[in-house]
């Protein structure tokens, strides 16, 4: 009788669902966080592309300087990311305009605006998993427009 009760308890699967949930839930949460973080990186990349295009559009207009373009690009990135408190050095690390002047020497010149931004995957959480080469990527956006006279 006692032997039969012990065998029945050993074969019982009570609590197995909780153990399976404890094993699967962290993996599932990490996958969902990765999907959300990838979507945020794509949103940041699209914002940088739009900001580069806006900067190039401003740069081809007469009377605008490189500082004007940098200010507009930084404003666009801040509005696009919703981070109004971010400083320009953390939002846009480089704005390159080629040629670097308000008006080029010849009328058919092209203006290229290049933006770079370092995106940290999973934010500060990536350091918990050892970081590595996939903890951050450099997003680069470039837009070229021809100056019409």
Identify the residue ranges that each predicted region occupies.
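Short, conserved structural patches
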Residues: 2-3, 54-149
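Alpha-helical assembly-interface signal, strongest on the long, hydrophobic N-terminal helix that forms
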Residues: 2-75
């Amino acid at each position: 009788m006692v032997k039969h009760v012990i065998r029945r308890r050993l074969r019982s699967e009570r609590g197995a669902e909780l153990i399976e949930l404890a094993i699967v839930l962290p993996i599932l949460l990490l996958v969902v966080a990765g999907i959300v973080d990838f979507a945020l990186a794509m949103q940041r990349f699209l914002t940088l592309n739009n900001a580069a295009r806006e900067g190039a559009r401003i740069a081809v207009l007469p009377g605008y300087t490189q500082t004007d373009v940098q200010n507009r690009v930084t404003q666009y990135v801040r509005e696009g990311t919703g981070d109004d408190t971010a400083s320009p050095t953390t939002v846009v690390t480089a704005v390159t305009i080629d040629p670097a002047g308000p008006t080029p020497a010849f009328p058919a010149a092209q203006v290229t605006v290049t933006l770079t931004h370092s995106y940290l995957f999973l934010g500060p959480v990536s350091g918990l998993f050892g970081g590595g080469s996939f903890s951050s990527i450099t997003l680069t956006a470039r837009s070229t427009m021809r100056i019409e006279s």
